Curated annotation (Swiss-Prot):
GO molecular function, one term: actin filament binding
GO BP field: actin filament organization; calcium ion transport; cell migration; cell-substrate adhesion; cellular response to interleukin-4; early endosome to recycling endosome transport; epithelial cell migration; homeostasis of number of cells within a tissue
Phosphoserine: modified positions: S2, S422
Post-translational modification: phosphorylation at Thr-412 by PKC strongly down-regulates the association with actin. Polyubiquitinated by RNF128 with 'Lys-48'-linked chains, leading to proteasomal degradation.
Stated name of the protein: Coronin-1A
Assigned protein family: Belongs to the WD repeat coronin family.
Keywords, comma-separated and alphabetical: Acetylation, Actin-binding, Coiled coil, Cytoplasm, Cytoplasmic vesicle, Cytoskeleton, Membrane, Phosphoprotein, Repeat, Ubl conjugation, WD repeat
Subcellular location: Cytoplasm, Cytoskeleton; Cytoplasm, Cell cortex; Cytoplasmic vesicle, Phagosome membrane
InterPro entries: Coronin (IPR015505), DUF1899 (IPR015048), Trimer_CC (IPR015049), WD40/YVTN_repeat-like_dom_sf (IPR015943), WD40_repeat_CS (IPR019775), WD40_repeat_dom_sf (IPR036322), WD40_rpt (IPR001680)
WD repeat residue numbers: 13-63, 73-110, 123-160, 164-204, 207-251, 258-296, 302-349
Organism: Bos taurus (Bovine)
Highest taxon of the lineage: Eukaryota
Amino acid sequence: MSRQVVRSSKFRHVFGQPAKADQCYEDVRVSQNTWDSGFCAVNPKFVALICEASGGGAFLVLPLGKTGRVDKNVPMVCGHTAPVLDIAWCPHNDNVIASGSEDCSVMVWEIPDGGLTLPLREPVVTLEGHTKRVGIVAWHPTAQNVLLSAGCDNVILVWDVGTGVAVLTLGSDVHPDTIYSVDWSRDGALICTSCRDKRVRIIEPRKGTIVAEKDRPHEGTRPVRAVFVSDGKILTTGFSRMSERQVALWDTKHLEEPLSLQELDTSSGVLLPFFDPDTNIVYLCGKGDSSIRYFEITSEAPFLHYLSMFSSKESQRGMGYMPKRGLEVNKCEIARFYKLHERKCEPIAMTVPRKSDLFQEDLYPPTAGPDAALTAEEWLGGRDAGPLLISLKDGYVPPKSRELRVNRGLDTGRKRTTPEASGAPSSDAISRLEEEMRKLQATVQELQKRLDRLEETVQAK
């Protein structure tokens, strides 16, 4: 009798554990917008989620530990004049978050340690360049202050947030229709996009050239998502001609046929992929689903291995994904999701069961830390670098707030209307400076006199 050989994997028994009620964020009005975004962004300090708001766009930012019922009068980030569609935390500054909105603008905000005490209406910088709503914002993974935005004008802009200037533009000649998704490669050298024209493209953004593209990675008409995974591969989610949901793995050098193509079910929600490069696990979260599927990617056939599925009763309106440095390593937590319900946000921990309480080095290789490997100028000049890695063996403590430095004279934001804001000093400021200069000159003269008297005394002795 033949014996079936089961593939060995340390992630075969990963299981999901939803947080208890007192560890959730209750009574929040999650956005009803139909845009296919996660509507939630998390980091080791804060959880942010897009909310329903009257009179414009708003999103809520809470300190990670501030769980329980959220006060209905809690201060929010509310500078946009139309609904917010996407939010993303800066990977190199846990206090900085970017937002894209239907008002055609991108705004970058600085959140104080401890969270907001008053509504935040003035961004650090406003980035205006799109002519239609902005549905995607994505920070460069290794270069400081480099932010990408994609709008429904079919244009991708890459911004230097430090100057408020769009330094790169990929126009509608690259994407002739709506852009569904954009993902940076791990070193930030390339981006991967999916578009309504049913093509997935690999693009070198600094040159504006298409390195590779695949027409119809999935035969269906519903939106496709694409992300980079390990070893020069990309993973796509989409629909078959019969409207079955699919996941596929591709070698970017040979896009003729997929390395693996699997059909999942017939649900209609778009599958949002989240890839963990440390474990090579990809998690698929469908909007409107009540489950999270996860697969392991390997370097040998069949390449994409189904692991398991976490299921719950209520469907999800969105999902946030915690960076690895925000996990509890002493509990063997390898991923944590923040599931948006209609009126709450629920953390879900993905855990590998282990008997030992010691640090599990095989689960936690060195991971991307909070420091940038490059400046914006270095990356724009052609340099590439992988993320600067840190060890989680002794845990991770988020650093104190880092100031986001912006050259305000180049900021194109709407609030730069006063002379002080535009960089030109007022007459009052000039008068104060002149008075301080006179005082300094008088002090220097007095010190010089004292020094002369001291020298005369020394010479007399």
